[in-house]
Amino acid sequence: MKYFVLLHKITTKMLRFISFGSGSSGNCYYLYTEEEGLIIDIGVGIRTLKKQFRDYGLSLSSVHYVLITHDHADHIKSVGSISHECQLPVYATPNVHDGIDRNYCITRKLSPSMKRFLEPGKAVQLGAFNITPFSVPHDATENVGYQIKAEGVTFCIITDAGSITDEMRSYISEADYLVIEANHDVEMLRQGPYPQHLKERIESHTGHLCNRDCAVAIAENM
């Protein structure tokens, strides 16, 4: 099931965000300043990503960092390929890196020399970006969202999420810009063609966020 990226705002004068893919076919996002940028998840093909950069008049040489939220294939398919070709460090928690190593769907294994490790709740400074990963419930090896501060604003991204925790609410409330999952209408899901076990997975607290819960999280915390 495809989810939709909900944008509170899209750009500022100095900080810009582009969604290159959102859904089960591949997820990839780009956040950048005038000097440098970072990619969040690389679940699209590398040729597709290169074309999208060209279409926006951008160059992959402006990318300095890669952040990964979790180890499902639609978020990591090309992480090893892009890291190798562009010599990009890949930042993720140790558990997510372990999951990437075990995932047979990625097009190229990630080089150990390109791995960088993050800890949920602990901020790191990467160039212009102050980045704090935080835990998000989802049925991956581990899953995080990111609070990213740059150019005087606070950006928050939550991709796959089964439910909203108090910690997530705190990060949402601090955000000037929010990207968050809105995956499905509950009744449409229940009456739809998916097998029962998949419906139950999607609706579970480690599955995917329904449209109503997404709307409530925004209304109550922003």
Feature locations, PLM:
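Structured catalytic core of nucleotide-sugar glycosyltransferases
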Residues: 18-29, 69-79, 83, 131-133
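A short helix->loop->beta-strand "cap" motif at the edges of active sites that frequently abuts
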Residues: 36, 86-89, 222
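Conserved beta-strand hairpin/beta-sheet module of binuclear metal-dependent hydrolase folds
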Residues: 3-56, 144-160, 177
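Active-site neighborhood of phospho(di)ester-bond hydrolases with catalytic His/Asp-centered motifs
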Residues: 40-43, 63-71, 91-94, 156-160, ...
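Active-site metal-binding motif and surrounding structural segment of the metallo-beta-lactamase
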Residues: 47-92
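Metallo-beta-lactamase
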Residues: 94-144, 149-152
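Active-site glycine- and acidic-residue-rich loops that bind
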Residues: 158-169
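Cap/insert and terminal regions of metallo-dependent hydrolase folds
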Residues: 167-222
